[in-house]
Structure formats: C-alpha cells, structure tokens
Amino acid sequence: MNAICENSLYSKCSCKNKYHLPLALPLYDGHCHIDLFFRYEFNKNDFDTQFANGRKMIFIDNKHQYYRWFTDYHLNNPNVKIFTTYGIHPKYLPSNISYVVKELENIFMNKYNNIIAEKVAIGECGLDSTSSFSFELQLTLFKMQLTLAAQLNLPVVLHGRGIESFNLMFNELKLHLNPTHRIHWHCINPKSDLNVIAAFLNYFKNSYIGLNCSIFSHDDLESQTLFHKWLVSVENIIYKIILETDFPFLKPSILESKQYNPISVGVDHIKDNQHK
C-alpha cells in the first residue's frame, strides 16, 4: 500500500506521507458477491465501521448461484448502494434447466415480491474449462441467457475461463446480441485470450472489461508484462475498464487477512500496482 494512505479510505486524515483519497469521493466495485461477504474472516461490524465516517460505496452484487437467487442479504448501511445481477454461472448449472431459466426471466419481469434488489444485468454467465459440467451443457445455458438478455434488452456480465472458452463465447455473442448491446466481460487477466478480447471490444461498442487482482501474476512476470503492454496498446482503454474485486474471492497475496476487504482490495492494490 505505497500509493494511498490507508486511513484516508475510511476517514479524514491529515498526515502528509501519502496521497489521501477524498472522503466525499464514492468508491465503486464493478463485480462482487454481497451474500458471501461475511463467510470468511471479514465481518459485518468491520464493514460498518469502514463506512461510519461518511465514505460511500457502490457495489455491483453478482448473484451467480441460481440456488441463492432468493436468499437476499441486506447490508442496511446508508452509505452503501447495491445494484444486483442475476445469472447462471457455468460452474453452477441446474438439472432442471427450463424451470430455472424461467425463474431467471420472472426475476427480471418483477414477478417475485420477495426480491427487492435493483436488478441491472444478466450474469455472470459464460464458459469455464474448470467446470465439472460439459462444454455442451454450459453452451446451452449460455445461449439461453444471451437470448433472454436480447429479448429484455438487459446488459450481460460474462465469465470466461480456459483459453478455448473465449472464441466460443465471442461467436455466440455475435450470434445473439447486436453490436450496441451493453456487455461487461468480467475478470480479464494475463490468462485471457487477448486477441479475442481486443476483437470483442472493437465489435461491441458498449463493451467493457473487468480488471481485478488476477491481473497480477507474481509467479509469471513475463505474462504480466505482456498483459500490461497489451492493455496500454488498446485505443481508449481507460474508457473501457471496470474496476472490480470479485470479493470475497481472489485475495491478493500482498494483503494480510485484516487488510482484505472490498475497499482495500478495490483501491489500494489495483491502483498501487498500476502505478508500478
């Protein structure tokens, strides 16, 4: 944490050692999992303490496990604003496909009174080579969600893992969505197929890529260097980036457990390493 004063993340600080993040500046996390926030070492009391002095934050909460769609977790913090996406992640596929996809449609058609979240997108959805489900089944669910997104004109949040996944996903995107559709390709990093991602950004005019701590490959500096070179080579890339944490996943090794929270990982680690 060399760039930003850690104290300034949570309150006003008068030290002159580092850059201070203005307390009035809202922070933004483009991809996280609110219902899983407090399953590990982070707790609700610490979370509320971080916002007690007025720091505001906007979270894009990703409900990627269909069996948890109806388990709403409310943070009840006046300084926190949450927008929610609903989708079927390729590692968590249902056996009763038609029923669950219909549930997904009904969620966005506001047919469930017990869901009060502000719904903003379908996802995360896509293909994952580490999934226990076949690519054929993953592809079926991916197509169904893209079809629904097109019908309801909903933004899409993408998940792709495994180099073979990217071109397949890009082809399906072009088949099901028009070039102006709003798309956020989550978790782009040195292991992504960057040629496909470049083509994706060029084809879909309202497309964005999500960057989180997975862009830092401390055990593979060559890949990290190549990724950074690719990143700065993309025209107007600064307008195409969504900063995200994927919290509570992707804990960076550089942070201690007590430092690992949506604010610290979303601000300090990403910005500090980008300056390097």
Question: Each PLM stretch: what is its role?
Answer:
Residues 1-276:
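Mid-domain alpha/beta scaffold segments of enzyme catalytic cores
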